[in-house]
Amino acid sequence: MKTLLLTLVVVTIVCLDLGYTLKCYVGRKPYKLITCPEGSKKCATVPLPTRPLPIFSKGCYTSCPSQYVKCCSTDLCNGSPTSG
């Protein structure tokens, strides 16, 4: 009986996690890791118009922004917290 109950719990957890959720780094340094909202299909790193040194912002997007340094569609693909 315990085995059946454990099996049902595991199957329920697996089924609840079937909805794909993209994870991206977001914001400016220090970057934060978040689970993107539903509908977000891309992670991107975009340049902000700053001088003299460029500043980059990372985030979740429904499609690639018009200006981007990196745009991708897998978990955490827009770089680590220590990268530009």
UniProtKB/Swiss-Prot annotation:
Localization per record: Secreted
Tissue specificity annotation: Expressed by the venom gland.
Cystine connections: 24-43, 36-60, 64-71, 72-77
One Gene Ontology molecular-function label: toxin activity
SUPFAM superfamilies per the UniProt record, alphabetical: Snake toxin-like
Tagged with keyword Disulfide bond: yes
Keywords: Disulfide bond, Secreted, Signal, Toxin
Predominant localisation class: secreted
Recorded family membership: Belongs to the three-finger toxin family. Short-chain subfamily.
Name of this protein: Three-finger toxin MALT0070C
Organism of origin: Micrurus altirostris
